């Protein structure tokens, strides 16, 4: 992950879950969906609302209050509901991935072991003592295996978007990994997303074909769009809107917009709650960057003091613990330190 003081770029984190479009296979995490409602159990509707497809959701009384020890990046939010089928088993639904992606939003705050423990707690909060709890834990381990396999790809699977052959290979490779690690969960987790990515790639192949005239390209694009199911067309419109919002956030950051200015402009695009969350992220990023810069200066003084490696490392660790007191901050700072060390 590229870091600005140890966090993913703001435009990436502004959308809470769901990797979408060709940006996913290019290694850019564009989080789709609305921001999580503070104090609710869903991204949009009431936590008691039925899950799509007539599936039941875990009993609402099992939900953990939003204030119950959430990582900083999820403060004031609640996890999505885990869907159940009529027999009480975990339903094979994209909503299960949404739950895990929500939890993964906290990975910059937590070590791998702490993230696992957090997911276990969040699952238990909804499904404790049920067969669905065991099933959800199994799917989590499968999903982690999928993500670990992606991370082991060359450049974490990132490819040159101008190379259509490489994009096609990346899509096929990710689909293979998903099926190998997730089994029959690969379709509910990634089926619709993979369809959209292949659709986007087909569009690119048409628009970049030098043998076609503009009229021929328009004709083929129109024919391709007609192949898209109505629900996919609606989903594509949402994705386009989300991409536009991400671009807007990036432009506002590039222009040096203040949190208040960013909030005012994004309110018109994302709504007041999402805009407020993005503005808060910007403030958090600025605060973190300032503290890490001060810490790095003090660390450099220790490194230049001529201490033995053991004493030097002990003093840097103590400094890190003094400066970064919130959960996960010291781990993130240590990770940045290692990155800075390898760069040197």
Curated annotation (Swiss-Prot):
Disulfide bridges in this chain: none
SUPFAM superfamilies: Lipase chaperone-like
Main location as per UniProt: membrane
Topology versus the membrane: Single-pass membrane protein
GO terms for cellular component: plasma membrane
Biological role stated in the UniProt entry: May be involved in the folding of the extracellular lipase during its passage through the periplasm.
Species, as recorded: Burkholderia lata (strain ATCC 17760 / DSM 23089 / LMG 22485 / NCIMB 9086 / R18194 / 383)
GO MF terms held by the record: unfolded protein binding
Protein name: Lipase chaperone
Family: Belongs to the lipase chaperone family.
Transmembrane segments annotated in the record for this chain: 14-34
GO BP field: lipid catabolic process; protein folding
Compartments, as annotated in UniProt: Cell inner membrane
NCBIfam families on file: PRK01294.1-1 (NF002333)
A Pfam family per the record: Lipase_chap
Keywords associated with the record: Cell inner membrane, Cell membrane, Chaperone, Lipid degradation, Lipid metabolism, Membrane, Transmembrane, Transmembrane helix
InterPro entries: Lipase_chaperone (IPR004961)
